[in-house]
């Protein structure tokens, strides 16, 4: 079949992105029909605990969808709790924030769950945190998870402030989560910027990047993110591939097998040995 470049039903092409600080276009109040009402999803953990996820009714930033990448990386953390237990975690583009909630339940030291600083989206993230019975606390300051607004590529200081004082040379998060963000091709550079700004420069620190190519004809553009990360000096490794029973958006065009496939990758700083090897090969 031909490979159209136009917008498909659910995942827009965004090469003229307006995701800038304060950069959502404003339209007259009656320009669009009323937004759909908020929705609710449920995620059942392996021990039977239920996490209720509230989502906004509609968002131009796709925050109204529980994406497959969020579910798959949450399941991965349950199978490998050592990846998040006693570690600091930052999720960007989180929407409902499922992976962050799971990381917090699994004993992360501190989780900062973020999305675009739209009040409705941030309120929903807080609602999901406060509504999770496994994360109940007597005092807000005792929580190991907080929600905040963040624009990709923006200043890291407000995010790092949630971690309190850190040792010199150890600023940053142990774990970053990027779930189903790569379809926004024009934002790849800012996503890599965020990894550079916020990932702790320490062995074992890594960004988990999990995604599906929802537009199979643009898969090469999704994967270009990893080329950019390598150009910036990061080491990229594939760690996961899962085939879902059906595509998230069943009626969308494109190869169904690709639309059912979720892959996971880690992006990390090189070790001293890897730096030396790269220098020797140059």
Swiss-Prot record:
Cellular localisation: Cytoplasm
SUPFAM superfamilies tied to this protein: S-adenosyl-L-methionine-dependent methyltransferases
Domain of life according to the entry: Eukaryota
Pfam family, one: Methyltransf_16
Record GO terms (molecular function): N-terminal protein N-methyltransferase activity; protein methyltransferase activity; protein-lysine N-methyltransferase activity
Residues binding S-adenosyl-L-methionine: 67, 93-95, 115, 152, 179
Protein encoded by which gene: nnt-1
Biased composition (Basic and acidic residues): 1-13
Record lineage: Eukaryota, Fungi, Dikarya, Ascomycota, Pezizomycotina
Species the sequence originates in: Neurospora crassa (strain ATCC 24698 / 74-OR23-1A / CBS 708.71 / DSM 1257 / FGSC 987)
Keywords of this entry: Cytoplasm, Methyltransferase, S-adenosyl-L-methionine, Transferase
Region (Disordered): 1-32
Name this protein carries in UniProt: Protein N-terminal and lysine N-methyltransferase efm7
Keyword flag Cytoplasm: yes
Stated family: Belongs to the class I-like SAM-binding methyltransferase superfamily. EFM7 family.
GO cellular component: cytoplasm
GO aspect biological process, one term: methylation
E.C. number(s) listed in UniProt: 2.1.1.-
Enzyme class, broadest EC rank: transferase
């Amino acid at each position: 079949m031909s490979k159209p470049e136009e917008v498909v039903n659910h995942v827009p092409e965004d090469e003229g992105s307006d995701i800038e600080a304060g950069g959502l276009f404003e339209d007259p109040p009656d320009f669009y029909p009323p937004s759909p009402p908020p929705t609710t999803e449920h995620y059942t953990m392996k021990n039977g605990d239920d996490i209720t996820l509230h989502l906004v009714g509609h968002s131009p930033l796709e925050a109204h969808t529980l994406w497959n990448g969020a579910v798959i990386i949450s399941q991965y953390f349950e199978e490998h709790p050592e990846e998040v237990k006693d570690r600091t975690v930052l999720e960007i583009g989180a929407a409902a924030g499922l992976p962050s909630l799971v990381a917090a339940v699994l004993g992360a030291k501190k989780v900062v769950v973020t999305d675009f600083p739209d009040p409705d989206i941030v309120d929903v993230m807080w609602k999901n945190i406060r509504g999770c019975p496994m994360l109940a606390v007597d005092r807000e300051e005792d929580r190991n998870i907080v929600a905040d607004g963040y624009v990709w590529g923006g200043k890291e200081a407000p995010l790092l402030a949630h971690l309190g004082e850190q040792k010199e040379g150890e600023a940053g998060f142990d774990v970053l989560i990027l779930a189903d963000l790569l379809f926004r091709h024009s934002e790849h550079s800012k996503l890599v910027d965020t990894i550079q700004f916020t990932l702790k420069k320490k062995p074992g620190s890594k960004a988990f990047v999990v995604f599906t190519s929802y537009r199979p004809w643009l898969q090469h553009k999704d994967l270009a993110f990893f080329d950019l990360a390598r150009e910036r000096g990061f080491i990229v490794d594939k760690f996961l591939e899962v085939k879902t029973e059906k595509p998230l958006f069943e009626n969308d065009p494109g190869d169904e097998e690709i639309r059912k496939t979720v892959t996971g990758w880690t992006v990390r700083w090189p070790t001293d040995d890897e730096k030396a090897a790269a220098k020797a090969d140059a």
